[in-house]
């Protein structure tokens, strides 16, 4: 509730689209999940207060991401999250450092990276992957999707799995790239 995706997308020239979940719109199993956690500062502040944090007593977190992405997105997140009681420190690193510290060693609190790979939902079913997301229901739904012999049935299992991941909110999908061809 604390991240204004529309503002982020607008700052990028409105060429990208809101994603809302782990499956992009061009992949099997896609469902528009952007409505699960709409931007709502009051709701975000309420949840932060329930957790014991306010703008006067913020939760301190560090966001580690590769400096190849520039600083604007990190600055936007820092500004947006400050409004709900999160003091975000930005740790810009070389991509090679990100690969070692975050991806290989899992040494991070928050991270930001361009996950533009197609058909990569399986990563959400692999607790050893650097997300360390572990939900047996998601793993079972994904296994059913792979075993299904009917494409529509497989898509339904993928949709259920993706919705569960999104509801658990182990990540925030800031936006998807809109492919443009000239």
Give residue spans per PLM region.
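Solvent-exposed, polar/charged alpha-helical surfaces in well-ordered, non-transmembrane soluble domains
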Residues: 1, 6, 10, 21, ...
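Structural transition elements
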Residues: 17-50, 70-72
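Short, flexible loop/turn elements at secondary-structure junctions
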Residues: 3, 27, 65-67, 94, ...
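Periplasmic-binding protein-like
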Residues: 1-27, 72-73, 165-175
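Extracytoplasmic/peripheral linker and loop segments enriched in polar/acidic and small residues
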Residues: 9, 88-98, 122-182
């Amino acid at each position: 509730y604390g991240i204004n995706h529309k503002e982020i997308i607008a700052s990028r020239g409105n060429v990208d689209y809101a994603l809302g979940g782990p499956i992009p719109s061009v992949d099997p199993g896609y469902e528009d999940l952007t409505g699960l956690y709409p931007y709502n500062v009051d709701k975000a502040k309420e949840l932060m207060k329930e957790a014991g944090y306010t703008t006067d007593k913020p939760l301190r977190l560090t966001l580690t991401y590769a400096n190849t992405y520039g600083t604007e997105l990190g600055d936007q997140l820092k500004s947006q999250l400050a409004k709900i009681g999160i003091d975000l420190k930005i740790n810009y690193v070389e991509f090679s450092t990100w690969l070692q510290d975050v991806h290989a060693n899992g040494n991070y609190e928050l991270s930001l990276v361009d996950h533009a790979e197609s058909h990569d939902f399986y990563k959400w079913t692999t607790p050893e992957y650097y997300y360390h997301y572990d939900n047996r229901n998601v793993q079972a739904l994904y296994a059913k999707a792979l075993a299904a012999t009917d494409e529509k049935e497989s898509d339904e299992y993928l949709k259920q799995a993706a919705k569960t991941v999104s509801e658990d909110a182990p990540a925030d999908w800031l936006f998807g790239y809109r492919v443009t061809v000239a």
